[in-house]
C-alpha cells in the first residue's frame, strides 16, 4: 500500500512579472516537511506550478497524494485543459503555444508517478495548510529579494 500524503502548495509574486516564490507543505503520517524557493523574475502562475512540481518531486516513491491549491489556473489546467493541450501538441484551442508549457510538462510527469486527488481551496481565508504554503511562498520571495526572516 502506498503512503497517503497531503501536499499544500502556493505561489507568490511581487509584481507580475517580478520576484516570486513558491511554497509546499508535505504532511505524511503526522510528519511535516516545508519546501520553498524563488526566482528573481517570474510570474505568479509559474510559481504556483513550481510549488506543485517541487512538492511532488520530493516524494521518492509512488504515493496517494491529496494536492491542495488555491490556484484555479493550476486546478483547471491539470484537471480540464491539459488533456486537450496534449492532443494538440501543447497548443491552445486558438492554436497558440500553451503558456508555461515547460512547467505543465514537468507537472504532468510528476503527477504520472502518483495517484493525485486535486482539491481547490479559496486562498487567504484561514485554511491552515494553505496559509502555511502561502507563508513559505512569501519566504521564497523574501529570500530572492535579500530579505532575511528570523
Swiss-Prot record:
Assigned EC number: 3.1.26.4
Cofactor note: Binds 1 Mg(2+) ion per subunit. May bind a second metal ion at a regulatory site, or after substrate binding.
Cytoplasm among keywords: yes
Protein localization: Cytoplasm
GO molecular function: magnesium ion binding; nucleic acid binding; RNA-DNA hybrid ribonuclease activity
Main localization, broad class: cytoplasm
Gene Ontology CC entries for this record: cytoplasm
Cofactor names: Mg(2+)
Catalytic activity line of the entry: Endonucleolytic cleavage to 5'-phosphomonoester
Alphabetized Gene3D superfamilies for the sequence: Ribonuclease H-like superfamily/Ribonuclease H
Alphabetized UniProt keyword annotations: Cytoplasm, Endonuclease, Hydrolase, Magnesium, Metal-binding, Nuclease
Amino-acid positions noted as binding Mg(2+) 2 in the UniProt annotation, renumbered to this chain: 10, 134
Pfam families linked to this entry: RNase_H
UniProt record similarity statement: Belongs to the RNase H family.
Functional note: Endonuclease that specifically degrades the RNA of RNA-DNA hybrids.
Record's protein name: Ribonuclease HI
Taxonomic source organism: Pseudomonas syringae pv. tomato (strain ATCC BAA-871 / DC3000)
